[in-house]
């Protein structure tokens, strides 16, 4: 419904929409006409801006809509038209949820008082408080009194309540008494369902009624048995008693199962020992300790798999076989990378160590240098050594130096060449000289004069350097 603020103190209705077809059944056309009349009367009323009423509360609090609960409709409504209109909508909702109860109560003999009088067709007709009080019996559904006979269930319809004046609070006491009676009937029905026998009631004890299927079950048939004496064979139990009985039986069944398992185990393990027939009521302390240890071991194993899975690439399968297979492949690949890096590290370290030794061996004023380094794996009869020749100059012919050294070694009988390596080193910026390094690994057999050999090599290099 759309409202307009008038002079910042009152609200008047500009437009409204009333959905009658989806909520009012075809059999209650009089009730629908009453609700529609209340709706038009509600639209024509002028409502002051007060925060404790609707729709002023929505405008003052800037709310798109306000949900009115049934217990708040008396307090939030501003006038009697609003109250009766809201409670007519509540009755329509209850009729939609409980169609069978309303069909049962709306018999022709007792439905005349629900039919509203005819209003004149002029636009000046309105609902007075006296007319509104005539339909106050529609505010809440009437609850039938339980029957005290053991016959078939005949649900009586209560007579219409006295008219209730919606203005004075002292006239609302019958309404609250009716509500209290309804709540008591609901409570008795729930208790009857919970404490009743497990066998379903006879279908012949209640009349068959046709209506729309709902998710709720009828309870008035149980209310009618309140005055009936309980059968001796039926034992009424509360929900707590039934729960305790269930868990007691569950505990007994578990103990019996443990006893059978232990009896089977003892019969197989100690059949010839003569000690059979002695059963325990549960697992022993050793078995419990073993079970606890096994559970902890599984938990640690699952945690280890979780940690290993977090280290693998994203997209890896989560099953344990896939995790182990991919982890093994990753470890093999990483081990290969580590081996390559270690080999490269050794090469770089050897190169740096050789360059440092060369820089230490060759002084700035020297043009060449010859040095011999013994290998620790040598023996007294067969020795292995490295002969290093460092030569510096502007123009150096590497092939001539290699030929001279090889010719010299060929002349010595007890010296054999194992390997040879030659390389050049770049000098600092601005220095045009070249440093040539030749490393020869030699094997010496028998007697050998190291100083004479080193001096002979120096003469060969000196002849080429000059």
Curated annotation (Swiss-Prot):
One of its GO terms (molecular function) is DNA-binding transcription factor activity. This is Putative transcription factor bHLH041. Keywords: DNA-binding, Nucleus, Transcription, Transcription regulation. Coiled coil: none annotated. One of its GO terms (biological process) is regulation of DNA-templated transcription. Residues 120-129 have a biased composition (Low complexity). Homodimer. It comes from Arabidopsis thaliana. One of its GO terms (cellular component) is nucleus. The keyword Transmembrane helix does not apply. PANTHER family: SPERMATOGENESIS- AND OOGENESIS-SPECIFIC BASIC HELIX-LOOP-HELIX-CONTAINING PROTEIN 1, TRANSCRIPTION FACTOR BHLH041-RELATED-RELATED. InterPro entries: bHLH92/bHLH041-like, bHLH95_bHLH, bHLH_dom, DUF7049, DUF7050, HLH_DNA-bd_sf. Pfam families: DUF7049 (PF23132), DUF7050 (PF23133), HLH (PF00010). Residues 268-279 have a biased composition (Gly residues). Residues 285-334 form the bHLH domain. It comes from the Eukaryota. It is found in: Nucleus. Residues 108-129, 194-213, 260-289 are annotated as: Disordered.
């Amino acid at each position: 419904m759309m409202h307009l603020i008038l002079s910042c103190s009152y609200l008047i209705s500009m437009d409204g929409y009333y959905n009658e077809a989806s909520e009012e059944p075809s059999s209650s056309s009089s009730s629908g006409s009453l609700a529609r009349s209340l709706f038009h009367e509600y639209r024509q009323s002028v409502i002051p801006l007060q925060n404790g009423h609707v729709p002023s509360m929505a405008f003052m609090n800037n709310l798109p809509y306000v949900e009115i609960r049934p217990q708040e409709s008396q307090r939030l409504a501003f006038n009697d038209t609003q109250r009766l209109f809201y409670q007519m909508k509540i009755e329509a909702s209850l009729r939609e949820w409980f169609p069978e109860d309303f069909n049962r109560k709306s018999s022709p003999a007792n439905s005349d008082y629900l039919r509203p009088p005819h209003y004149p067709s002029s636009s000046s007709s309105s609902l007075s408080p006296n007319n509104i009080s005539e339909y106050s019996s529609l505010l809440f559904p009437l609850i039938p009194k339980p029957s005290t006979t053991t016959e078939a269930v005949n649900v009586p319809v209560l007579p219409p309540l006295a008219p209730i004046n919606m203005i004075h609070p002292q006239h609302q006491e019958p309404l609250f008494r009716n509500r209290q009676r309804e709540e008591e009937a609901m409570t008795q029905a729930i208790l009857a369902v919970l404490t009743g026998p497990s066998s379903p009631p006879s279908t012949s004890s209640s009349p068959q009624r046709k209506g729309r299927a709902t998710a709720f079950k009828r309870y008035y048939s149980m209310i009618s048995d309140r005055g009936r004496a309980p059968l001796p064979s039926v034992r009424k139990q509360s929900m707590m008693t039934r729960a305790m009985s269930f868990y007691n039986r569950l505990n007994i069944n578990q103990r019996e199962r443990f006893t059978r398992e232990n009896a089977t185990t003892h019969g197989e393990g100690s059949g010839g020992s003569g000690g059979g027939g002695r059963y325990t009521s549960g697992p022993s302390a050793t078995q419990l300790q073993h079970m606890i240890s096994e559970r902890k071991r599984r938990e640690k194993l699952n945690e280890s798999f979780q940690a290993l899975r977090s280290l693998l690439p994203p997209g890896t399968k989560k099953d344990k076989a896939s995790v182990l297979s991919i982890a093994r492949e990753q470890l093999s690949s990483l081990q290969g990378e580590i081996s390559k890096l270690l080999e490269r590290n050794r090469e770089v370290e050897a190169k740096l160590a050789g360059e440092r030794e060369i820089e230490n061996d060759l002084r700035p004023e020297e043009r060449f240098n010859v040095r011999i380094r013994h290998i620790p794996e040598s023996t007294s009869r067969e020795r292995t050594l490295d002969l290093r020749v460092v030569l510096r100059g502007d123009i150096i012919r590497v092939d001539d130096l290699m030929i001279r050294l090889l010719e010299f070694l060929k002349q010595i009988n007890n010296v054999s060449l194992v390997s040879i390596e030659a390389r050049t080193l770049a000098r600092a910026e601005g220095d045009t000289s070249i440093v040539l390094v030749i490393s020869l690994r030699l094997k010496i057999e028998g007697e050998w004069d190291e100083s004479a050999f080193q001096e002979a090599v120096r003469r060969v290099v000196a002849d080429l350097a000059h």
